[in-house]
Amino acid sequence: MTSNNQNNSSSHQHLHSPSKLTEFARNFEDKPESLFGRVVNKIQNVYNQSYNTVNDISSGSSSSSSTQPVQVVGKSQFFSDSQTSTAEIADVETSSQSSVRPQPPTTLSIRTNSETRGTSTSSNTAAEDSETSDRVETLPLPTSEANQGRTVSNVLKHISNIVATKNNNDLRNYKDTELQRFWMPDSKAKECYDCSQKFSTFRRKHHCRLCGQIFCSKCCNQVVPGMIIRCDGDLKVCNYCSKIVLTFLKSSSSEMGQDMQELQQHLSNKLEVQDSGSSLAKHPQMQRAPLPRKTSVGYQEERFSSHPTYTTLSIDDRKNILQQSNSLITLHEEMQRDLPAQNCGQRLIEFLNSNNKSANEVQAVAILNAMLAAGFLEPIVPDPEQMDFDSSLHYKFSKSSSSDTSRTMSPQFEANPHAEPQPPKSMDQSAEEKEKELENELENDRCYTTATSKLLASYCEHEEQLLAQMLRAHNLDQEWDKVLQMLCSTAANHFKPEHCSNDLMDIRNYVNFKKVPGGRRKDSKIVHGVAFSKNVAHKDMATHVPFPRILLLQCPIVYERIEGKFVTIETVLLQEKEYLRNVCARIMSFKPNVVLVHKNVAGIAQDLLRSYEVTLVLDVKLSVMERLSRTLQCDIVSSIESNITMPKLGYCNDFYIRNYNGKTLMFFEKLTNPRGYTCLLRGGSNAELTRVKRVASALLFARYNWRLEMSFLLNEFAQPLSPKPSIFDSKETSPKTETEAELRSKRPIILERKSEDKITTIVSENVSDFTDPLRASQAEALSTSPCAPPVVEALAVEPRYDNRFRTALSSTLLSVSPFLTFPLPYLETEQGRKCKLRKLFPAELYFSKQWSRTGLERPDSMGDGEAGKSEPGNKENQMQLLPAHDFVLMKITAPASSRDIQSKLAEFRSFGGRLPKGKAPMLRPKKKNAEVIQRPQKVSEEQLYKDALDPQNHQRLPVLFCSFHYNPKGVSSFCKLPMLLDMKFYGQYDIMLEQFLQRYCCLFNSMCPSCNLPMLGHVRRYVHSLGCVHVYLTEDLTRSDPTRIYFTSWCSICNATTPTIPLSDAAKCLSLAKYLEMRFHGHAYKRRPPSTDAEQGGTVCEHSLHRDYVHHFSFRGVGAKFQYTPVEVWETDLPSLTVQLDLPQPFQSAQVQEEIKNFSIKGHEVYNRIHERIADLATEEENSPLVQHLKTMLTHDQFIFKQKIEIVHTLLTDNRATAYDTSDALAMARRALAESIELWGPRLQEIEKLTAKQAHHIDSGTICTEELRPEQVQTADSSKVTTSSLPKENDPLECPSEDTETGASNSQTVLDKNFSIDQMLASTVNVYSDKKSIRKILTQLLPSGNQVNPLQSPFPAQDHLTLPLGSIPIHVRETDLSSVIAYSLTSMDYQKAIDEAEANSNAAHSSPQLKRKIPLAESVSDAEDSPSLSRTSSNTSAAPNASVPSPATAASESEEKSKERIKQPPSPHITLAFQDHSCQFQCKIYFAREFDAMRSKSLKPPKLDKSLYRRLEKSKMREELRISQSRTGSEMELVRKPSDVGAPRTTEDDSNQEEDARIALARSLCKSVQWEARGGKSGSRFCKTLDDRFVLKEMNSRDMTIFEPFAPKYFEYIDRCQQQQQPTLLAKIFGVFRVSVKKKDSFVERSVMVMENLFYGCNIENKFDLKGSERNRLVDPSNQQGEIVLLDENLVQMSWSKPLYVLSHSKTVLRDAIQRDSSFLEKNLVMDYSLLVGLDKKNGVLVLGIIDYIRTFTLDKRVESIIKGSGILGGKGKDPTVVNPERYKQRFIDAMDRYFLTVPDRWEGLSKV
């Protein structure tokens, strides 16, 4: 121990500079350091700190000055088995100087420390081999940034090549390595390599132990452990190399032990204080991993893995070396002979010890570790966590030496969240039974060969059609097909799929097409190897070398210190020749014949290599070098200076150069087992061969994919389709039932029996994409059949839509695989064309050259035959050019300074162009100008959009991928959020099926770092089109061979199973994306019947092999199951910009008849009671004229009531009547009865107080109903008639009525009748001429509010039926505020106020003297001053209890008010007041004009014919009841007058859009019911209109205060959306009102907002209120009653098992609308809004809308956000619901994007949107 420490101390003392060194842990060995060793190390550290020079290194100066090249035979220079010492090195430089021609360098072998020690027994041989193999390093893949000299890639490569493995026990001295030989000599360095400071006595020279350059003490003061290059002690390195070491350790942290991790932390702490201007910051590539790889699906998830990863190349290389060890081979054979096949680990150790194979147990374990690494021994139950030998495990001897690289991969585990499909019981059998069953099945299965031939035949037919299509698309001769098929089939069939790496799966990476113009097409051939355009660097170099040794250099061979850094010429002259001679010596130590360099080579180096007879090729493309590296299986050396291990050279059969018509090609042919091919294309021009190359590349891809795909189809026992499938096989959606599949197979027979009309319908809705290779031929066959005309007609005749896409699609092959059926784009289906969102997208949604070429290249008058010959610019090409000038054609012999030449040149310049002069573009006709503008637009369209019908754009599979841990009893969480992956077939995001199973499925005991739960509980889900594939794991108990992947499947419907067989080598290399594509679109495949069942006539499963079967892969004790399940895809329904109001359903006649019957009985009872009271009076005053006239008036009222009832009966029996007609008639009938009760009740009370003397002198006369009609008609002629309200919630008589017009009614207001009766009585008084006495009597008969009505009313007390009639009859209820709003909107006062506001608005733009404003009070007072408004029981005024002023006072007040209003801005609100004998109402309408304007654009009333009710009412008005009074009694006669007699004064119907929308809104608001809306926390009360169209929400005072400044901006935003036709999610507000109801003992005042009901007409099963927050957003449905509104967390929990998938176009519209609306709300400081979502499963629609968007971020909300965000109130650290508007907006957008997931389809990314 002491001697060793002293030796270490002596070797270390020259490796440190004085005081700038940082101490590191000196001992990195596994054994603990003794106390004496620690003391020695301490003394050594103190000594190192005081040592100031490291320039003189023992035995290094002399050797470093030597520049002779060296060569290592067989192994690396540092791990050679030769016993030659360093003293035996010959001085080649001296000998070369004395000879005429330089000779290749001699062989050099170096002995390592471990080899000099040796062992004394033969039993150590295996251990030595093991130790030696542990020291062997392989070169990693090259990087693209490699430069000569001390660059990032060079040093990284240097470190990665020499980094030590886990065995650190065998370290050596730095002097025993070859690094010191390649140091820069001291005599060649005059300044520091980094800072360029001159060396002097005080600035000494220091060599970096890694790069070998010379630095000053400041630039070389870092220390790294020598174990990174398997040296003992520490190494002194420059700052640059120290940082590179740190970067390397960080990039491979998973491979480090504890000591290495401590080193990394120590280096990080040291270097973090370095300035940002260091050389490391100048190389951003250092931040990347040194071994980049292609992105794949697995690569996205490798962060889940908790296992260390190892480089596959290093393991393979190590294993190959170990397998070549004779001692291990002999030991393996002896152990197989003497031991059983399976043994315990302890038994193997005992065997080695007992047979003298090892001296102790440690050596035995080392030998067994070597056997494990070589593949001679493997555990029975593989455990990826246990990489080394374990005596407690059981092992078996392996016959196969193939490397099992899967244990180094990152695992992924999932479990199915749904009911796990269980395999049939027959599958539970041992591996031996499966093997026997497989052999019997394959031997006896005579269907295997038949299936193969059928599959091949179908593909060949498909390939021919695909090739012909591509040749036509590229304007190529069809004769190319035979040539291309021969070339591609040779390459695809001979290339071995296992040669593909996971990063380069596409065969086109291994087969290159080279264009060689000239020759004949049949001269095209396949070269087994690589061919490219290049020549040798010098003509004296050999151009033909049989069996060459090829070296690939990525770095330049030049002297360049730092790229881009200035350097003095003295240093270059001093060091360049020495440096290049040293580099060439390193190159020649590898003995190459051909050297290819990616960059340039200095002239000195070229001469040196030429003198050694080396063929040099310069400036080779990196892609060519990579292809050579793959084909020849050699390394690309990134740096000669830092490469200390033996690089792997390339070997081939022949190297030669050929010249083809001036094009020089360089060939590297490898005839045996080539890993690459080159196809030489000949027989055309360069332009033609460019197009041929594209076609050939696509054909090669298709042929190679089918080779792998067919192999998998045979493994899964797939049954090929019938030879003649129907061309109408393509459904617009994926098949869902087996019945559809059966009908699909029989559809050709069905089509023959269908009529022509039926066939036309089928074809128009189902257009196949002709992916099936037999469909095109079937289409040609059907084109000649009798069914052809209707088919062609169905495809061609579609006037409303552009049919170019579907027509082109019907004759285009999109897939390289046969028998795949793709659904049409949703927006191109009939259902998609009719959806609401279709109008938001362009009419031509997809672009294709198939029709754009026609519009661009061919004029309208050009025939079809000339279409292919024309080109975009041929119109200009056909122009006649002017003759060329003489100067262009003359031969110039005189100098340019001569006068003749100058004069000719001047004349040529003034000559002008050769194109004929035409009109200026601005003066051309419009048609030509339009063509000039459109041409570049079409060309740019080809550049902007992808061709949707190009098969190359369909060689991908867009999927929605996610991974999550599903816990049905707890909380689930995403480990990988759903993300859209565009999986390119055999390219980006794709992975081999075998690699996918090995890396992410078949590994145990892996924990997810995201959720820290076992990966076995995780789910991996791939969603595409209308289905998804779940991948989940189970434990495989069959004990199958762990080196093979077994496959089986079983039907989930009938439990039919396929035999368990090993997956073939070709099937293992199938693309995962192609496998998933078959699961999504290959539903036509069925299970191939076994031969035994076919012979015995047994039943065969007819279910889809890819839709109904569960696929099971078993590997190393783990079973991976793939199950396809259909998904529910939703269409979104946003709030429409225009709300279409529907016409109510007609009443049920029987029910209404019963209601009318009951109502008529009640009315007759009322009139009978009045008759009885009058009859009682008549007994006392038998001959009283007053009694007679009372009877006449009662008869008149009864007649009017009877007319109203008859109108209702007539409407019920007329089919033309609408619900509006019936409802209006019922409302007027109720109003007539209510008016009679109000009049006759008080009147009968007063009759008892009158004497008969005051009435018996009235003479008898005649009274007719015409005289009883009012003289003044106050109803609006042009107004609409609406329905009245219902007495009961479900009363059908009160449903809204038709939107009709009405003239003057027979039943006018009660006051009008009183006025008419007063006139009648005044004209019939004969006895008493004193009218005052008569008026006094009638005044006493008027109803009084202080009296109690003796007549009992059949209507509820809170109903008010006798208010002044407006545009339509409205039934006002005290408890229903919506009826008060409806009455206010239809009242005459509201219309007058709107007109006044309009007049004021117009007056603002004109002179105030020209227009007089009519105040509301004035208009009301004028109305009240009329005789018809004299009754106090039906009074209207501007405010409750307002007194009626005199005309003079009102006029003066109105003038004063008008002057004040001119000064003040007009208020946008209108306040209306009205009352009757028992109640006062007031309604304030906010922003009346603005809401009217918005409603006129947003509400669309139903289109109705002329009201039938109005015609009937006019007809009844012409009926007169003539009543004759005589002493004997009354005589009545019904007389019908002509239509123009007695008709009311009407005006023509002027359609007013605002009024129509307002009346339509009032019809819905006339009746509402309470609605218990759940989910909100505001506590507001809600109501819904009876027709379910609108929602009324109560608003508090704070909401009203916020709404007033917000409303103008809201109107502007909605108007802009309507003008620009931009969809919005904001639920529209149709009015805000404040309603007050005042009675004697109560007063109610509420503010109400009227909004649209988002769920109108929808069958909503689930409702969600989403805010984007997950804090307290969970509802327990079990604890809720009634209507349940779920929240965010409920939706998240549902997304694990049943996410909300939406179509792609729906997600596009939804995302834009959310972004636009949330931005608008953010600008107005609005937050806390919600997205209301309803699931209409019946129609497959998500109904959405944003609600509660009034609340702003006020002070109280700020305080709430701060308190909840602090965590004082809990919340589990989640973001509070209420945050500032900017933050709320972003969170809302992100959450909605997560909640609604897009389901990609085949057409994802190909549309113009």
Curated annotation (Swiss-Prot):
Phosphothreonine: modified positions: T760
Region Disordered: start-end pairs: 1-20, 84-146, 274-300, 399-444, 856-876, 1269-1307, 1399-1465, 1521-1554
Pfam families linked to this entry: Cpn60_TCP1, FYVE, PIP5K
Keyword Transferase: yes
Regions of compositional bias (Polar residues) in chain numbering: 84-127, 1272-1287
Enzyme Commission number(s) of this protein: 2.7.1.150
Cysteine disulfide partners in this protein: none
UniProt main location, coarse: membrane
Gene name of the record: fab1
Cofactor(s) required, per the database record: Zn(2+)
CDD domains assigned to the protein according to its UniProt record, in alphabetical order: Fab1_TCP, FYVE_PIKfyve_Fab1, PIPKc_PIKfyve
Bias type Basic and acidic residues, positions: 431-444, 856-874, 1454-1463
Protein name: Putative 1-phosphatidylinositol 3-phosphate 5-kinase
PIPK domain residues: 1473-1796
Residues reported in the UniProt entry to bind Zn(2+) 1: C192, C195, C216, C219
This protein's record includes keyword Phosphoprotein: yes
A single Gene Ontology CC term: endosome membrane
InterPro entries linked to this entry: Cpn60/GroEL/TCP-1, DEP_dom, GroEL-like_apical_dom_sf, PIKfyve_PIPKc, PInositol-4-P-4/5-kinase_C_sf, PInositol-4-P-4/5-kinase_core, PInositol-4-P-5-kinase_N, WH_DNA-bd_sf
PROSITE patterns referenced in this protein's UniProt entry, alphabetically: DEP, PIPK, ZF_FYVE
